Amino acid sequence: LIRKLTKNDYRVTVVTRNIHQKSYIIKTQANAGYIDIVEANIFDEEKIRSLFEKADICINLIGILYEQKKGNTFRNIHTVFPSILAKLCKEYNLKHFIHLSALGINDAVDSDYAKSKLEGENKIFKNFPLATILRPSIVYSVEDNFSTSFMTLLSRLPLFPLYYNGKTRFAPIACSDLTDIIHHVISKNIYSKIIECVGPEIITFKEILQKLLKLIDKKRILLPFPLPLAELSARFFEILPKPLLTRDQLRL
């Protein structure tokens, strides 16, 4: 996204929580003079507010798949923070606010993740009606977290569990296509919309795993798990620092 925007003559300010970890990667995405990197806690409202004084457009890409300690809850990240951004967009009369949400949240009524996303969308439109919200399916790219996590597990485990018999359907979208959509929304002045962003292929979870197995040249047993066993395994995964699966994700 940084490359796309700076190539089209936008100057970008990137806000990151860890400038020492991310700055080298970020700096390589644009020519000097087109990018500023700011380290900030997203709930330091005074620091965030200062960034709006010279901004025309705000793009929020922040989201989490599982909750952590230190305030990283679904509600804080998906509801409270986007609401703060929307209020600041209105206060500083920004031209646009583009917010990345998630596909399928209307139907996942039992998921805390989905409910927090949906509530965040509602608060955004209440505070800044001109906002445009993008709802992407799974986003993939080179070395993305989704693909690499599953490929690592598939390379190590002799069998892999299939939840809901692996029939859950996705329409994965390439990261480059999603960045094109974001640029299109900006350049064509698209306001007050919810846009669902999907790729050209509808594919099941089982088919995704089969494609990944082919990429790593491995053969594994894909074993359907009944829901009670799936929830039990999710409890185990939740113990890990970066859980591959949570009980809330089973409700999506």
What are these regions (language model features)?
Residues 145-146, 165-187, 192-196:
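Substrate-positioning beta->alpha
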Residues 32-35, 151-164:
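A short C-terminal helix-loop "cap" of Rossmann-like NAD(P)-dependent dehydrogenase/epimerase domains
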Residues 185-248:
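Mid/C-terminal beta-alpha module of Rossmann-like enzyme folds, strongest
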Residues 109-111, 132-151, 168-169, 203:
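Flexible, glycine-rich beta-alpha linker
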Residues 20, 24, 29-91, 103-107:
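NAD(P)H-binding glycine-rich loop region in Rossmannoid oxidoreductase-like domains
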Residues 1-10:
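N-terminal Rossmann NAD(P)H-binding glycine-rich loop of SDR-like oxidoreductase domains
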Residues 18-20, 201:
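Residues in the short beta-alpha loop(s) of Rossmann-like NAD(P)-binding domains
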Residues 11-13, 64-65, 72-127, 131-137:
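Conserved Rossmann-fold NAD(P)-dependent oxidoreductase catalytic core, especially the SDR/UDP-sugar
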